[in-house]
Design a protein with these regions (language model features):
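Short, Lys/Arg-enriched N-terminal segments with co-localized hydrophobic residues
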Residues: 1-9
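Generic structural signal for beta-strand residues in well-ordered domains
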Residues: 6, 36, 55-56, 83
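A generic structural signal for alpha->beta connector loops
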Residues: 10, 40-42, 87, 108-109
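Two-component/phosphorelay signaling modules centered on CheY-like receiver
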Residues: 19-44, 83
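Acidic, metal-coordinating helix/loop segments flanking the phosphotransfer/catalytic sites
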Residues: 42-62
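CheY-like receiver
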Residues: 54, 60-109
Length: 109
């Protein structure tokens, strides 16, 4: 969770989504939020879980993860990230309700 005190900290956000259109749309939503809120956000996009974990370097504040990706899906990606970064906020982006409970296993939102 962020605590904003005084000047805003630039938040580092990762978007991990294999579908180009969905990835661009989510990045667009984040950019719109940045414009409307006046916050500075550094957004990095990845097309698959394998891209962010090979090797994962802690430093992101929030990671938006698609659940179903061809090479490395969202759950195994989250599990690998949690091994080295217990503090990053993980947010699963999916329309598949059956994954909601599993998300709690890796302390995701």
């Amino acid at each position: 969770m962020f605590t904003w005190k005084g000047a805003y900290k630039m938040a580092k956000i990762a978007v991990v989504e294999d579908n180009d259109a969905m990835r661009e749309q989510l990045c667009g939503f984040i950019a719109q939020y940045a414009r409307e809120s006046g916050r500075q956000l550094d957004v990095t996009a990845f097309a698959d879980g394998a891209e962010i974990v090979d090797p994962y370097r802690p430093g992101f504040d929030i990671i938006f993860l698609d659940i179903e990706m061809p090479t490395l899906g969202g759950m195994p990606t989250a599990e690998r990230i949690r091994q080295v970064d217990p503090d990053v906020v993980l947010v699963f982006v999916t329309n598949m309700a059956q994954y909601a409970i599993r998300g709690y296993e890796v302390d995701a939102l």
